[in-house]
Structure formats: C-alpha cells, structure tokens
Curated annotation (Swiss-Prot):
DNA repair in keyword set: yes
Catalytic reaction list: ATP + (deoxyribonucleotide)n-3'-hydroxyl + 5'-phospho-(deoxyribonucleotide)m = (deoxyribonucleotide)n+m + AMP + diphosphate
Chain residue ranges for the region called Disordered: 604-632, 914-1126, 1146-1197
Binding positions (Mg(2+) 1): E303
Key words, A-Z: ATP-binding, DNA damage, DNA recombination, DNA repair, Ligase, Magnesium, Metal-binding, Nucleotide-binding, Nucleus, Repeat
Gene Ontology terms, MF aspect: ATP binding; DNA binding; DNA ligase (ATP) activity; metal ion binding
Location of the BRCT domain: 651-739, 807-909
Entry cofactors: Mg(2+)
Protein name: DNA ligase 4
UniProt-listed Pfam families: BRCT_2, DNA_ligase_A_C, DNA_ligase_A_M, DNA_ligase_A_N
Known tissue expression: Widely expressed, with higher levels in young flowers and roots.
List of residues binding Mg(2+) 2: E418
EC number: 6.5.1.1
C-alpha cells in the first residue's frame, strides 16, 4: 500500500529531483518512484504531496510564512525573544548573525532551527499519517489547534523531513520541475484531463495505466475548467501580423475577477482561474443568475466587476470582496456586483467549446437576458454596447485593419480601462491554452506612462535568490517647500523593485547600505523627515537615515493611478517599475506631491504623456536600446501654474460676484476646467492656490493633502453646492448638508440658525432637505417607549390592536401544488404587512414570538403534529409552552377585521391533551415539591378591610432564610437540574424570560391573588374559547401550592400562573393575604419559602380545609404511585423548613417513607412531629400561642406517617416580628 510508505522515501525523491540538473533526469526519477513504491490504486495519496498547489480535496491551511513562524515558535515552546525565534520571525532579513546564507528561504531557516531540537533520526512518519495530519491542520479553526498539529509533526519527523513538510504547507516545493512535466510523465493524457476537470484525484484514479490512452473528456457543469488565456503582445502592429487575414474581434479587457459561472438548475458555482469556488458572490448574484440565464444547465466565462450606479460606470478594481460582503450583510450602497459574460462553454446538455467564437457569441445572446449594471453580455453587436453611456467608446467591435485596433486601443486607454484583447472569431475554446488565438495589449507593455522622479526612503529584504539583501525600495514624493528652500518632508508613495538588473540593484544597495537604519517599529518611530502611514504593507525593513544620503529613481508604471490607502500620497501607481537610477540628480529635485496630483488631474486620473512618438510603438526595440542614452523629452510642469483659459467664456449670471473659489479636489464626473468655467460664467473668480483672497474652498471628498491643508484655514464646501446654484441660477444658502468641514467659529455661528436635526429656522425645506433632516433624527430602540407613543399617538384600534403581539408565520404546505404555494406566499406577505400596520411585530425567531400563525389554504385541514415536525427539538419545546399561542390564520384575519385582539383559545391548533400534558407536568412537579402543612384547607375569601399594608423593607431574601435554616434528615426533595447559575425550575410552565424581570409590590399582590391553583383536575379552568379575566376570584378553589423563591424573586404560585408573575420584585416578599379581595385558596407548605398568612381564621375553617386538602392529596398519591420510580433523589434543604425547625426544637422526628413521582417531578419527604417554642430563639409572647394540630392522613402505597397540623397564623406573626 502506498499509504504505508514512509515519508522519508518521498523526502529522498524530493532531494534527488532537486539535485538533478536536467529535466529528463528529474522526470525519470519521478517515474521510478511511481513504478517502485506506488500502486496504481493509490497514486493520489503521493501525487497530492508532490504537487500540493493543485490539490483541492484539502482546504486551505491559512498559514503563510509569518503565521507559520509564530506557530512553530509556540510548538517548539521557545520564547519570542530567543535568537531562534527572532530568526524565524525575521526570515527575510540578512546578516550572518541572524539569518545567514539562507536568508529569504523560510523552510531552510526553519530546518536550521529545528535541527538543534529534532536531530537526524527519522520519526517513522508514513504518507498516510502525514495526509491525516495535514487534513487536521486544514480543518483547524484557530492558531492553538494548528500549533498542536505542528507539534505532532515535529515529534514524528526529523529536521530534513520537516523542511519538506513546511514546503508542502506553503504549497511551494521548489523542485525545479513544472506541473506540466509531472503530468506528462504520469500519463500522456493527464494534463488534458486536468484542464477540463481541475480534479487531481480524478486524474489519478482514471489514468492508472500509463500505456492505455484515455478518450478525451469534455467539460462538465459543476467541475471547474482551466480558462483559455491570452498571449501577451507589446505592439499593435505585431499583434495584427499574427492575426492578419482572419476575422478579429477587439474587446475591452476588464479589470476584475475572471470567473466561470456554472449553473445547474438553482445550483450556482463561481470558479476562479485557480479553480476555487468563490461562494461569497452567491448572496448578491445567484438569484439574478437563475432568473436571467434561460437554460437549466450552462457554463459562462466572464469577468466579475463592480458597477457604480451614481457614476453610471464600472468602478476601479479591488472592491469586489467588499461589495460582496456588503450585499451579504444587507448594507445599502451605490455600488453593486456586475457579471460581464464574454463567452459560453456549455448550453443545455452539450459542450459548445468546439464551436467557433462567432457561433458561441450568437448562443450567448440567446442564453443570457442582459440586465443593466448587474448581468451584461460582451459581444460586437448588442449586449453591453447598448448600455454604454453616451459619448463613451464601444466595449467590443469587429476590426478590419491595424488602424482600427490602434484607434480602439487609444479610446480604451483614455477611458482608464485595463487594455484590450484581440480574438480570432473562428477559434475554438481551448482549456488552459495560451497559443495566440487570443492576444492582450495593455498600456504598460508599450510604455505609455510618464517617468516620475522619486526618492528612496526605505528598503525591503528579498526572498529566494535575493534573500538576505534589500531587493525592493519604498519611495516617496516631496512635500513642496517654500521658494529657494529644500523640502523637509517626504511622503511615502509606492513600493518598487523590478526593472533593474542584478548588477544595477547591487550597486544601488551598496551605495545606500552605510545609511541603512533598522526599522524597530513600534519601539522607535520612523525618521522625522518621512511621513508614513505605518500600514503593514508599507512598513520597510530598513530606513534611509537621512534624505540627503539617498538616491533618486526614475520610475514608470501603468498609466492608471489608484487611490492609496497604504501610502500617504493621495495616489499610488499600478505595477511600478524602475526605469533608471538618476545619479545625476540631487535628492531635493525629486517630484513633489502637489505636482504629481496636478499631473493626475490634468490627465483624467492617469500618468499618460501628452504626446507619444509614433515610432515608440512602431519600433519598440529601438526605443528600448536607446532609452538610457537619450534624455526623455518629457515636461512635468505643475498644472497649478497654468491658468485655465477662460478668455472665450461669456457671463450668464452674477450669482458668484465678489467670490473667489479654490477647488481642493473635484469629482471624476467633472474636470477642474469645467468648474473654473462654471464659476466665471456666473460672475465669480477662481484661484489656483489657497491664499488669503479665497472666499470659498470647494471639494468633492474629505481626503488628500490639499484637503488637510484647506480645513486648517477655513470651511470646506461640497461641490454639489456650486452645481445646485448654477442649475437654479440663484445663490442658495449654505445649509449643513453642503459642508464637508466646519471651523469652530462657523460651527458656533451655525448653531444659532439650525436646530439639533440641522433644520434651519429661516429656510423652508424641500423634499431632499426633509429626507436629510429625518435621517439625522435618532430612532428610539426602547420597545416600551415605542409602544407607549404608538398608543398615545395612534389611539385608533386598527393601528394598535396587535401592539403586544409578535407573530411567527408558518406556511402549512404539506400537499400543495406550486401555484397554491405561490398563493400562500402572497397571503403571508399581506398578513405580515397588516400585522405591522396593526402595531404588531413579525419575527423569524420562534423564541421571540408570542403567536405562531399557521397559514394554509381554506380547504386544507391543519395537523399540529405535522406542524411540529418541521421544527427542531428546542423549538418543539417552545410549541408546548402556554405563552406561545399556536393558532390558525383565522384568528389573525378576524382580529384584524374586528380591529381588536381576539381570544386565542377558540382558534388554537395545539391539541388539548398536549397543552394539558405540559401544564400537568408542572402540576405534578409542584404537587411533589409540596409537603402538606397541618393547616391546608382552602380558605375563604377575606374581606377587603383585612388588607394589611406591608412595606418592601420587610421582605427577606432567600439567602437569609437559608442561613437561618437547620438541616434535617427528612428534608429530601426532588429537584430539577440547574442550568448554569440559574435556579432550578419548579413548574413546567415557567419560562426563561420570567426569571429576569421585576415589578412593583402592588403588581405582585394583585397577580398572586388572581393566579391561584387547585389540585383537582375538575377545578382547573381549561374551558376552550374563554379567557380567564384577571382580577376575579375563582369558585371552588382548593389548596394553593407555593413555589420556592429564587434569589430575591417572588415565588411562583401555581402551574397555571401567568408568566407575568415571574416578574415580581423579590425584595417585596410580603404576605399574599395582604391583597384586597384575593385571599382565597391559600395554604402553607413545610418545605417551600412563603410568607405566612396574617389574617385570622376560625378553627372550624381550618378543619374543613385540612380534610379537603388531604383527600385531594390521598387521591393523587394513589393514582400515581406506580409511575414514580424513575428519577434520582437530590437532598436539598428547604429554607423555610430549616428556619422553622430552628425556631421550634423537635423532641422526636418520625421518618416517613418517600414516594417516587413521575419523571421530571420532585420527591418530597413528609415531616412529622410537634413544633414547640424554642428557648434559643427567645420568641415573643405570640410564639407561645402557636397551635399544633393533629397529624395528616398517611399514604396507602407507600404508607405515609401521619403528621400533625401546625397553624401558621401565630408563626407568621413571629416571623414578621423579627422583620
């Protein structure tokens, strides 16, 4: 088995291949390894380690050199300050004391560090074990897990083996053998099969026999295909010579992500050129793709771009991921993803790559339905050309001569696009082909950019061949100084390293090396001469100690500039290259930032030269050979010294009279000259510099050096104010919406003219102004405040009848057709809107809902069991909660029709037995946690005059009761498991929400009286369709069960008690009998913490109550004894019982047998004995009057010991007296 091969064998193969000089030797050793050690059925386990960059079965490791160095340091257990740790972290840097000869090669430096800790003996790691560990490494979600895997690898390998493991992780073995050579040696058809499947495992499994040719496989939907590529060409004439005599189409080369879209029904994949599936595009694009691609199966080849709706054009490259993330998070933006399809590879069930490009263009127009700004088609006739803005060039044309190509290329470059692609219309689509059927022409290939003189201020160490020495430079532009003064500040501009030969680079480095200063960020700041961002991508390894010691470089780039976030300069360059080293130029003559910005603005955001010699493109070789000997005839005159020519401008109005404008920056949609002419047309003047005569500073955005300078001196106004004034031909007031920056003086003055929402006291609002004011008003997030104002401001019932409802909609579509499901969806949308209009809320979270409304067609029967099957186990438990009403849509329809919230019981879908089982479980639990007191009969209703006012200061916390309690052997109690730090639940109807709220004592007193319980099933108010009204006493009430307190919260009184009773303030624990007119149904339990009754009752009432309660308890015990053997006991000391036992010493206690209850209930111990006065407690005279009654009846099975009745009337007085 290949899996059992030691990894050391594969390491030997790597070493042999790396040492071999010729390609044939490398290939023969690879072939010998396969024939000797590998079985055909197990090729993949070894090949995936030889070319790891093509293995897509294993996910990304998420480890580059810097992170991998940190993980290795942790895995080895060495300090970050140790020399070996510093070498790993600074692997790029040179110096024999640190990195040595291996500087720039991370795997070799890691091997040196590991060699002193691992030794040379192999750990016996097999290929299978290595693959398993690499799978674990790829699936690890945090650095700690990755470190653990690396530690295991270190234990099972030696330093030489670990070096190759690190290279496999970095997916760069540096064997000097291309994947093309490996495929050719593995099987003659391997490369072709991989190009159409991008599946290395499939290649290894299908091509086991090297001598058996494989039938050429066509592309399939769902499997990535290597894209056809364009050959680079540097000259229009050279490109035309290769395509002469053929039908050629010229297309704009878009600057985006090359993406293949695979559609199979509703299953959409977005494969990149590296055959990675970019699922991040799915949220923004998948629905659009499904609706606008008119076939079920299809493969499109195209470019994913960003469309700017405000500018009506494509945005600059680099924001795809940002826009995809914004769409995924539901953020509004004026930018959106747009896919431009320029080829189709698969239609229906057939591959069309063998058809000509012209035929594929016709298919593309039939298959894709274009949607402006979202899904476009790039074809010569129609498609994207139809949607282009007026005045802009076409995106795709058929060319017939080199002049047509030249003209199209210039138009594309002026439009700031990436370049053009020339395609043979008769060519077929070839996966991975770069033979010249497609050719690309980009501006940097023909030196269309201007040469810029910049100053070196820092350096970066290289890797690989240039490891250990500075190979790239950080260059800067000067901040313009005053006349006849050298610049004192330099702003970071870009990073450049290509363009020089090794000798030229070594010469520059040797001249600067004496002035290198190590960058010790963050310990030491950069030299004060340099203005930098300290961005990680900007931060150099070394600084140039002083600008006077530095050298000027002449650099060129793509003609397009990009707005910089990494560097201080407002613009940076794309693909910069060093043209030559300017030893002849002193350091202070480098280009300044202001001149560069004006150059960019004057050339519409590019660095294009004003006039390019035609011979440059006709004969690029001559230009290249003579570029160093001849001085370029390029003039970079700062445009701020050149006034806009306004001699032919005629005045239209005088709205800007006596005003002088200075434009800090302008939008891309307008040029600086346009604004200058606009100001002059309306009677104003403009200045090219910011001086004291300027009255208005205008800007398009709050960024850039010029903006920072302007805002230090005066207010900065948005350019839209100028446009609005000109469009309306009148001077508009400077409202807050027009300001980009306000000085302190202007801000103070403006506060007298506007309110807190920026609404002016003196000017009327238009529609746009009203929208702005409303957007400035903060929205309240307090739901209670919102409900209060809704009731106050919308007193009509139709706007507030569902104010307290939160509705969760469930579509019941068990046997519906597609059309009926669509109608059900429309019904759901209508009801959602009506709920919102009626003041209710709609939620997608069942835990937040108060009503689950089941939507169904009129004739469809509803089944609660089928409804519950659609939910998770946690949600099923919520469905049984009484607080959640499961109703049909008729309840909602009729409530909306009558403009009032109807009782839910009539419309409930939850079967009564399910609802009762939920409440019944609560009753059983409470029944078992209740030990019947000697006085337990149902009490008659107290008159209103018996209400006793007790302040909240008398309330005792549960903690205090526990401290005063005394442990007892009879106080066995069955309790539910606690969840975290939450108290155990006593009743099944109790909810999590009830544990978190508190209310005033008056609310608690009224709620306790209203929610009394009864033990008898016949006495439970469960009639359907009638809602019990709060505030009314119930008829035929029996003993009341009171639950133990939780912390400072009031105890819950019964299983049917509403959830509102859980929200009582625990500090106000007063007697429930103190309520007005709600004293019925009270009893006291030995184990529960409750306040004693204060009202006095006659002895005859007590005897009647005792008989009734004991009869109910006896019947309940006899009926449930056989089911009560399922749960374990947990000994729990009841606070009130312990307190009573401490107050009344018991001469003798009789242990009672406990009876097991049904699952989920509590076990209770019956306590017998007499309660006498305690000498230790020194009670007052009322304690001596405590009555001791006869014992209770005993249970039948198991027998219960009779217990004596204890009157708690006097005990209550004693307890309250202590308080």
């Amino acid at each position: 088995m290949t899996e059992e091969i030691k990894f050391s064998v594969l390491v030997s193969l790597f070493n042999w291949i790396q040492k071999s000089k010729t390609s044939s030797q490398k290939r023969s050793k690879f072939r010998k390894f396969l024939d000797t050690y590998c079985k055909p059925s197990d090729y993949f386990v070894a090949v995936r380690l030889i070319i790891p960059s093509l293995d897509r079965e294993r996910g990304s490791y998420g480890l580059k050199e810097s992170v991998l160095a940190t993980c290795l340091i942790d895995a080895l257990g060495i300090s970050r300050d140790a020399p070996d740790a510093v070498r790993l972290l600074n692997w790029r840097k040179g110096g024999t004391a640190k990195a040595g000869a291996n500087a720039g090669n991370f795997s070799l430096i890691a091997a040196e560090v590991l060699q002193r800790r691992q030794g040379m003996a192999s750990g016996g790691l097999t290929i299978k074990e290595l693959n398993d560990l690499l799978d674990r490494l790829a699936s690890s979600e945090n650095r700690a897990e990755k470190t653990l895997v690396l530690s295991t690898l270190i234990q099972k390998t030696n330093a030489q083996e670990m070096k190759w493991v690190i290279r496999i992780i970095l997916k760069d073995l540096k064997l000097g053998m291309s994947e093309k050579s490996i495929f050719q040696e593995f099987h003659p058809d391997a490369e072709d099969l991989f190009n159409v499947t991008c599946d290395l495992k499939l290649v290894c499994e299908k091509l086991r026999d090297r001598h058996q040719r494989h039938k050429r496989q066509d592309i399939e939907v769902g499997k990535a295909v290597r894209p056809q590529l364009a050959m680079r060409i540097g000259d229009v004439n050279a490109a035309w010579k290769k395509l002469h005599g053929k039908d050629v189409v010229a297309e704009c080369k878009f600057d985006g992500d090359r993406i293949q879209i695979h559609k199979n029904g509703t299953d959409i994949h977005y494969f990149s050129r590296n055959f990675l599936d970019h699922s991040e595009y799915a949220h923004a694009m998948s629905d659009l793709i499904v609706q606008n691609i008119l076939v079920d199966k299809c493969i499109l080849d195209g470019e994913m771009l960003v469309w700017d709706t405000s500018l009506n054009r494509f945005a600059e490259f680099g924001s795809n991921q940002e826009i995809a993330k914004a769409a995924r998070e539901g953020l509004d933006s004026h930018k959106q993803l747009c896919y431009v399809a320029f080829d189709v590879l698969y239609v229906g069930d057939t591959s069309v790559i063998h058809q000509s490009l012209k035929e594929r263009h016709e298919l593309l127009k039939k298959v894709v339905k274009p949607l402006k700004g979202r899904l476009e088609v790039l074809v010569p006739e129609g498609g994207l050309n139809v949607h282009r803005p007026s005045g802009e060039p076409s995106w795709s044309i058929v060319v017939h001569a080199a002049a047509d190509v030249e003209r199209f290329f210039k138009e594309t470059v002026e439009n700031r696009d990436e370049g053009i692609v020339l395609k043979d219309l008769e060519s077929k689509w070839e996966p991975g082909d770069r033979s010249g059927k497609w050719m690309k022409l980009k501006p940097e290939y023909i030196r269309a950019g201007a040469d810029l003189d910049v100053l070196i201020i820092g350096g970066y160490y290289g890797s690989g061949r240039r490891g250990g020495e500075v190979a790239q430079f950080l260059v800067a532009l000067a901040d313009r100084a005053e006349a006849n003064v050298y610049p004192r500040r330099f702003m970071s501009f870009c990073r450049v390293g290509t363009g020089l030969s090794d000798d030229e680079l070594n010469t520059v480095v040797s001249k600067l090396k004496p002035y290198f200063r190590k960058n010790e960020h963050p310990k030491k700041a950069p030299p004060s001469f340099y203005q930098v961002t300290n961005h990680s991508k900007e931060r150099p390894d070394v600084w140039i100690d002083s600008p006077e010691k530095s050298i000027i470089l002449s650099i060129t780039s793509d003609i397009r500039t990009i707005r910089s976030e990494v560097f201080v300069a407002p613009y940076s360059l794309r693909f910069p290259r060093i043209d030559k080293v300017r030893y002849d130029k002193p350091w202070h003559e480098c280009l300044d930032v202001q001149a560069f910005v004006e150059l960019v603005n004057s050339s519409n955001g590019t660095t294009q030269k004003q006039k390019e010699s035609e011979s440059t493109q006709d004969n690029p070789k001559v230009n290249k050979s003579s570029k160093r000997g001849e001085k370029k005839n390029v003039s970079l005159v700062p445009s701020q010294f050149i006034q806009t020519d306004v001699s032919d401008i005629k005045g239209k109005t005088s709205i800007f009279s006596n005003m002088i404008f200075y434009f800090v920056n302008v939008p891309r949609s307008h040029s600086l000259e346009t604004f200058h002419k606009m100001v002059v047309e309306n009677g104003g003047k403009f200045s090219m510099n910011l001086n004291n005569s300027v009255t208005h500073c205008i800007a398009a955005e709050s960024s850039g050096i010029k903006y920072q300078a302007a805002k230090r001196q005066r207010d900065v106004i948005h350019f839209s104010w100028v446009l609005d004034c000109c469009s309306r031909n009148k001077m508009l007031p400077l409202l807050p919406k027009y300001f980009l920056h306000l000085t302190d003086a202007s801000r103070t003055k403006l506060q007298d003219d506007i309110d807190e929402f920026s609404d002016s006291y003196y000017w009327d609002l238009d529609l746009e102004g009203l929208k702005q004011v409303l957007s400035n008003a903060k929205q309240s997030e307090d739901s209670k405040s919102i409900d209060y104002y809704k009731k106050k401001l919308c007193p009509e019932k139709r706007w507030s009848c569902l104010l307290s409802c939160c509705v969760y909609f469930y579509p019941y579509s068990q046997t519906l057709s597609t059309e009926e499901e669509a109608l059900l969806g429309i019904m759901a949308k209508r009801l959602m809107l009506e709920v919102l209009m009626a003041g209710g809320k709609v939620s997608n979270n069942l835990a937040h809902a108060s009503h689950l409304v089941v939507l169904a067609m009129a004739e469809e029967p509803l089944d609660f069991t089928l409804v519950s099957k659609s939910f998770s186990e946690m949600e099923k438990r919520l469905l049984l909660k009484k607080r959640l009403h499961v109703v049909s849509s008729h309840w909602l329809e009729e409530s909306l029709q009558r403009e009032e919230k109807l009782c839910e019981d009539v419309y409930t879908l939850r079967p009564k037995y399910m609802e009762e089982s939920d409440t019944e479980e609560s009753d059983k639990s409470e029944h078992d946690t209740t030990e019947v007191a000697s006085q337990g009969s149902a009490q008659t209703k107290e008159p209103a005059s018996s209400k006793i006012a007790i302040t909240s200061s008398r309330g005792r916390s549960n903690t205090r009761a526990v401290k005063r309690g005394r442990s007892s052997t009879n106080s066995l109690q069955r309790v539910q498991r606690r969840r975290g730090k939450q108290p155990s639940k006593i009743s099944g109807d109790e909810t999590e929400e009830s544990d978190a709220s508190e209310e005033k004592v008056s609310t608690r007193l009224s709620d306790i009286a209203e929610e009394t319980d009864s033990f008898g099933e016949a006495q439970r108010n469960s009639s359907r369709g009638k809602c019990a009204k709060r505030g009314k006493s119930r008829v035929g009430q029996t003993q009341r069960v009171q639950r133990s307190r939780r912390g400072k919260k009031a105890a819950k009184i019964g299983g049917d008690e509403s959830d509102e009773n859980d929200e009582l303030d625990g500090n106000n624990n007063v007697s429930a009998d103190a309520e007005e007119g709600n004293a019925a149904g009270r009893s006291v339990e030995n184990e529960e913490t409750r306040e004693p009754d204060i009202a006095k009752y006659t002895e005859s009432q007590q005897r009647d109550n005792t008989v009734a309660v004991e009869e109910a308890l006896q019947d309940s015990r006899n009926a449930k004894t056989e089911m009560d053997m399922k749960e374990k006991l947990q000994i729990h000391e009841d606070p009130l019982q312990a307190m009573l036992m401490k107050m009344f010493p018991i001469p003798s206690q009789k242990t009672t047998e406990t009876s097991n209850r049904t699952t989920g209930e509590y076990r209770k111990a019956n306590v017998s004995g007499e309660c006498e006065s305690s000498e230790k407690r020194k009670l007052d005279a009322e304690t001596d009057n405590t009555s001791v009654n006869a014992g209770a009846e005993s249970d039948v099975v198991p027998p219960l010991v009779k217990k004596k009745k204890v009157s708690y009337r006097d005990v209550a007085g004693e307890l309250l007296k202590d308080w």
